[in-house]
A protein has these predicted regions:
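Phosphate/NTP-binding elements of NTP-utilizing enzymes
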Residues: 2-249
Length: 249
């Protein structure tokens, strides 16, 4: 059995290598299909350069524009959030009607046409900055248990399976508690967990009794687990055209 699992993972990694060579700078992952399964927790595993993070940004920015939904960009530690100031750098030009900024732990924007601007006491126009999302480290999530996030629709947990295999102590429980803090049992929040690689020995699959072997053996792109609460996508099994949108531009 171990040999069969090893063979399945080896094939998956071979496909990932091919995908990395095929992907161009203008390609990005489209979350439309996996969202159609309506699973609250989604694991998206695919080649580096697939555009998973870019696609997630496009999704949550679109959610704010259309419905004013907010997001949380989650990383494991505060150290992993140190580059949050550049979070909008690769996507800002796609939204010429908006100006973006990161203020503290908040992602913010305002309309460049000043449609909802205000005037100060001197009559000068002041842009109205809106909170689009929050940058939070899971290691510090216990500090926000009393904070309400009623407008958050999506949590994006980037690099859920770290290359160095270093997880937090009690990490799965911490994520479950954080999810409940944000969702407040309203069944409103969805969690997108992205990874460039997968190892079967990880605390998440162990906690939820996820056996990936049949999915690997059958080259199945999407598979539900835990009565549909969780879905795992092995994105590289879908073929280039199945999961990559035409272009950023």
């Amino acid at each position: 059995m171990d040999r069969q699992i090893s063979t399945g993972l080896s094939l998956l990694y071979d496909i990932m290598d091919i995908m990395e060579k095929l992907l161009g700078e203008g390609d990005y992952y489209d979350y439309g299909r996996i969202l159609s399964y309506h699973a609250p927790w989604m694991f998206v595993i695919g080649a580096r350069g697939l555009g998973k993070t870019y696609g997630a940004k496009k999704l949550v920015i679109g959610d704010w524009i259309k419905k004013r939904w907010q997001f949380i960009y989650l990383r494991r530690t505060a150290e992993e959030q140190k580059n949050k100031g550049t979070w909008f750098a690769d996507i800002a030009e796609q939204y010429p009607e908006l100006e973006f900024r990161v203020s503290g732990n908040q992602a913010e924007c305002h309309w460049l046409d000043d449609r909802d601007a205000t005037k100060d006491k001197h009559g000068k126009t002041r842009p109205t900055w809106h909170i689009m999302g929050y940058f939070i480290a899971l290691s510090q999530a216990g500090q926000v248990k009393s904070v309400a996030y009623p407008k958050v629709r999506t949590i994006v947990f980037d690099e859920i399976f770290p290359d160095n295999m270093r997880y937090l102590g009690g990490e799965v429980t911490a994520l479950e508690e954080f999810y409940n803090t944000v969702d407040r049992w309203n069944d409103r929040v969805r969690v997108i967990m992205c990874s460039n690689a997968v190892t079967l020995a990880n605390p998440y699959f162990s906690a939820f009794n996820i056996n990936l072997k049949p999915q690997l053996d059958n080259h199945t792109q999407y598979q539900r687990y835990c009565d549909g609460f969780i879905i795992v996508e092995l994105a590289d099994y879908g073929g280039f055209s199945a999961k990559v949108a035409a272009s950023k531009f």
